[in-house]
Design a protein with these regions (language model features):
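Short glycine-enriched nucleophile-adjacent loop
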Residues: 25-36, 149-151
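Short, internal active-site loops enriched in acidic
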Residues: 23-25, 88, 138-143
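C-terminal catalytic histidine-bearing segment of alpha/beta-hydrolase fold enzymes
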Residues: 96, 116-159
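The feature captures the conserved acid-bearing segment of alpha/beta-hydrolase catalytic domains
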Residues: 40-124
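Extended hydrophobic secondary-structure segments that form protein cores and membrane-embedded regions
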Residues: 16-21, 43-45, 132-140
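Gly/Ser-rich "nucleophile elbow"/oxyanion-hole loop immediately N-terminal to the catalytic nucleophile
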Residues: 1-23, 130
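Catalytic phosphate/metal-binding cores of nucleic-acid and nucleotide-processing enzymes, i.e., regions
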Residues: 18, 32-33, 39-42
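Extracellular/periplasmic catalytic domains that process cell-envelope and extracellular macromolecules
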Residues: 10-12, 35-37, 73-78, 127-128
């Protein structure tokens, strides 16, 4: 789709970004983990769950069961992902409660922080490229308008 938009615009090097909040952010973690993307920025805000950087955790929460799971994991960690987290996104309304989700943490903020730290540690352990960033928006809960109008989002969008 991005290639089509670039061709139609006559700008073959036009950058593209993937941005999602809540369920949209959760979907983006799956896109980033399991599909090829040429996005120059991927901003994942407050998802209920993440794709963990683990070949021992089964799909859709990790890479176990995917063909070529380790190369996929390596590519995932090299993507330009910003984990944009609300500093007050600590509620449990509409939070995934499957055992695999609960294992990620008790709320979206905890899950995002833990996933980022695990991703950084795995990349460092293997000597792989790691292009993720973590940005927290203080005082904001599960609110896409406040998240995406924050200075942290502006920076994540490269504006």
């Amino acid at each position: 789709m991005s290639a089509r938009a670039r061709a139609a615009s006559g700008q073959p090097s036009l950058p593209s970004a993937l941005i999602g909040h809540s369920a949209g952010g959760q979907f983006l973690t799956r896109v980033a983990a399991y599909a090829k993307t040429d996005a120059t920025r991927i901003v994942v805000a407050n998802p209920s769950t993440w794709v963990l950087p683990s070949v021992q955790t089964a799909v859709p929460y990790g890479f176990k069961g995917m063909p070529d799971s380790e190369p996929l994991l390596r590519a995932y960690l090299a993507l330009p992902i910003t984990a944009l987290l609300g500093g007050n996104d600590t509620g449990t309304n509409n939070l995934s409660s499957e055992p695999e989700a609960v294992a990620q943490g008790i709320n979206r903020l905890e899950r995002g922080r833990a996933t980022f730290e695990k991703a950084r540690a795995i990349a460092q352990q293997h000597g792989w490229s790691f292009h993720w960033t973590l940005a927290e928006v203080p005082g904001v809960g599960h609110d896409s308008t406040k998240m995406f109008s924050s200075a942290q989002a502006t920076a994540a969008f490269g504006l």
